[in-house]
Every structure is written in structure tokens, then in C-alpha cells.
From Swiss-Prot:
Sequence similarity: Belongs to the GeBP family.
Species this protein is from: Arabidopsis thaliana
Keyword Metal-binding in record: no
Single GO biological process annotation from the record: regulation of DNA-templated transcription
Pfam families in UniProt: GeBP-like_DBD (PF04504)
UniProt protein name: Probable transcription factor At4g00130
Keywords assigned: Transcription, Transcription regulation
InterPro entries: GEBP, GeBP-like_DBD
Amino acid sequence: MMRLRRLLERMLRRCCFRDCSVRLTKSLCFKKLIEFDATKNQIVTKLQRLKKKFNNAVKNARKKGQTEDEVEYAKESEKKRFDLSIMIWGSNGVLVAGKSSKKKVAPKEMKPEETDAKVVNEGLSIGREMVPFGSSCGLDESKLTTGWENVEDGAEKREVEEKWKKFKDKLFELLYERSVLMNKTEAMMFKAES
């Protein structure tokens, strides 16, 4: 367990994207980070099992109506593993479960509810999104997060947060299109080999 946790920590330091397990299957860049002998298949299998454990923990927590802070662990190492898994496969520290059913169900039409909702300050999550981008540009992470926390709540801050959300959505769309294109390319290569 200790070796796997170290591997995950190193993966997080090495890459800033959340598709570490996908990148691992495509290259052996993480092979150098491992202190023990393991084949590519063993590493991939280990990561797949870890992701499955993470998804199961998320599903169980959701069934119980718990958040990530309320989930109880038998061992401290399990908590550390779960925290690392959230950083890799989670979404801004929010528990995300995969689709449980394989059937496609037609979505029900929902009428938008009219409520007096207050704007929730999501500055911390926006600050987290800025940190990887800023650190890749050579900016100090701690100054970015503390600087964003010091900005007063207001219309201008909400406008910037909305722009970051739109940017994040566009980035996800681009990553999805890239994975579809990669899948199509691999299918063409496989077809050419056979």
C-alpha cells in the first residue's frame, strides 16, 4: 500500500491532468518513478483496481448521503489513498461517481424551479483551477491562492469565476474530442495491422 501511495503522489507531481491512468497506458513515463519491478500490465491493473475502489467508495458514500469529509476509514492509509484518488479522478475535490447503469434512459423533462438562490462563493475551487495554469507559467502557487482569497466578493469576482467555468467547460470538450479522435486513430491503426 505504501508503494502505491508513493506512486500516486509522484504521478500527481509529474502531471497536472486528471487522465494519469490513460497516459500511463499510452507510455511508460511513470516506470522510472517506481522503486520496484513491475510490468506495464501490473501497473495498469493496479491503477484500475484503485480507481474501482475509489468509485465504489464514492457510490457507498453517496448512498449514505455523506461528503468526502464525513467518510470514515478503518486505517489512516485508506484515508490517504482516498484523498490521492480524489486528486487524480475526482473533480475539484468533489466526489464523482461513474455511471451505474449501462441502459440509456430518456431524460425526463424538468421545469426550472424559480427560487431566490444566493450566489455561493466558489472562490476556492476557482483558485484551485488557476493554480495549475499559473504554476505552469512560473507563478507561485501559494501567492495565487492567497491572492484570490483576498479579492473581495462582488460582481467582478463572479464574472471572472464565470469565465473560468466557461474555460473549464471548453477544456473538457476539447479533451473529450481529443480522446474520441485518439480512439478513432487507434481503431484505424489496429485495422491496418490486421
